[in-house]
Amino acid sequence: MENYSDQGGDGIELLDLLFDKNDGILRYENMGQQNNQLWPVQDPHMMMPPQGNEDFFNALIGGSDSVSGSPVWSPSPSDSGISEDPHSDHIDSPPPNASPPMEPHIVVSQTQHSLNINFPFDFNGWETGFLPDQAGGTQCASETPQAQPATGFPLTVKDLLLSGTPETAAKVSQQSYQELILTEDEKRLLAKEGMTLPNQFPLTKYEERILKKIRRKIRNKQSAQESRKKKKEYIDGLESRMAACSAHNHELQRKVFQLEKCNISLMEQLRRLQALVMNGSNKPVQAGTCVLVLLLSFTLILLPNLKPFTDTKVSQHGDFSPMRVQSRSLHNLQSSRVLRNLDHPYSMTENAKILPRFPEDKTMEEIASLLGRLHRRPQFTEYDPESHNHSFDQHDEHHHGDPITGHVATVTLNPRRGSRRSPHADDM
């Protein structure tokens, strides 16, 4: 460290000698990036002498005694929380974004009081670049791997120059060495994968990738859990609705079954009622028909027999009513008697005494007497009984009536005629 402190002034003089715009050796070289081009790169096979390279770094580091405690910066944003100083001036800002990353470049600006140089170094490995030696010449340095500092992060000249301020150094140190807090899920996943992470920042790129991977898995797991939870809630809702619908469906089916049974019973009762109505309507019709037929038959059979074949008499004295006369058989009998009397003539008195009188003869006498009484009445004065009826004494005639038509037939017996057979008339 004493060697570094002794050579601090020589390093500043060396930088002035190299980068002075008026008298500097590299004043004609384009050290910045213009038109998207970097400063020229020499042949990588030209090796820089080891002594000159060591002197160059000793001169750069000699301006500060706190090299080991200088803050480190991460060149790119990450989850470790390391970022560049937000209060840096636009003069100290890095080149435009169009430049290729990880390429070494130098931006030089000179002021009256101080010289700020933004010259990032990648100690993971040098590729190409200009490195001045103590003699003031320019030599090309090829890949010259250097020993990596204890922190494992690249250092810049800006960090080295600003590290002399105690407040800035404390602030950067506080930001750099923050504690890494891991959740239980992150610790469990790290243990499952067999990886470990330090408890404090900064983290390497590999560790940052591991941390990002673990956190991404945790986010995916939480998202999957939320999705499964929502899906489960949705399925539970559907199941509850399906259960309610099933219960309602069973209730409706039960009601339908009851209605079907009621309908079947009503149909059976309707059929029975129809059968009863049909049977009841047929029986009266048949009974009525039979009764009518029987009545008609009895009427047709018994009507002719309702009037008896008996003698009718006058109910009152002086009334006239038709009466029944002798039948055909009796008429023939009387005719035979008349003919027999003609063959053996004798007096009527003797005949009356000898022969018995039939009931018909008595009836005829009664009729004759009745007609005589009618003739005596004043309303029948013009009635001539002689023209209608003749007694046996006068003309020896008999009045006979037809039993079917009721007409009276007149038979006249004339003893003067020589005919043996007496003519008679029949109105049948």
UniProtKB/Swiss-Prot annotation:
Primary role: Transcriptional activator. Binds the cAMP response element (CRE). Activates transcription through box-B element and CRE. Seems to function synergistically with atf6. Regulates FGF21 transcription.
SMART domains listed in its UniProt record: BRLZ (SM00338)
Leucine-zipper: region residues: 252-273
Residue ranges crossing the lipid bilayer per the database entry: 287-303
Name of the protein in question: Cyclic AMP-responsive element-binding protein 3-like protein 3-A
Source organism, top-level taxon: Eukaryota
Biological source species: Danio rerio
Pfam families assigned to the protein according to its UniProt record, in alphabetical order: bZIP_1
Post-translational modification remark: Controlled by regulated intramembrane proteolysis (RIP). A fragment containing the cytoplasmic transcription factor domain is released by proteolysis. The cleavage seems to be performed sequentially by site-1 and site-2 proteases.
GO biological process: regulation of transcription by RNA polymerase II
